[in-house]
A protein has these predicted regions:
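Long, highly charged, low-complexity intrinsically disordered interaction regions
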Residues: 4-6, 10-100
Length: 100
């Protein structure tokens, strides 16, 4: 498992980011919350990660805090909630707002 990645942002959209580290570009799917909390293209960033492997894809998910990452893991443990739904939930509110 990859716990976190630290590198330079080379591409960024509201739900996806590319981080370059040691000449390799890593694509990470992110929530809108994470997108708002990190820098812009050219900035250094540290994202906590979850690697999900399925029959169709290998996807790396990135989070601006380990707290958000752990909450994502909690969400996807709920039956019927997959990674995409969990990211949408995290995009709508902060972890603190969801808990309250």
């Amino acid at each position: 498992m990859i716990y976190y990645i630290k590198g330079k942002i080379v591409e960024k959209s509201p739900t996806r980011i590319v981080i370059e580290k040691e000449g390799i570009g890593y694509i990470l799917d992110i929530s809108l919350l994470t997108s708002e909390n990190i820098g812009n293209v050219g900035d250094e960033v540290k994202l906590y990660t979850i690697l999900k492997i399925s029959d169709e894809d290998i996807i790396l998910y990135g989070f601006s805090s380990s707290y958000e990452r752990d909450f994502f893991l909690l969400l996807i443990s709920v039956p019927g909630v997959g990674p995409r739904i969990a990211l949408r939930i995290l995009s709508g509110s902060s972890v603190e707002e969801i808990y309250n």
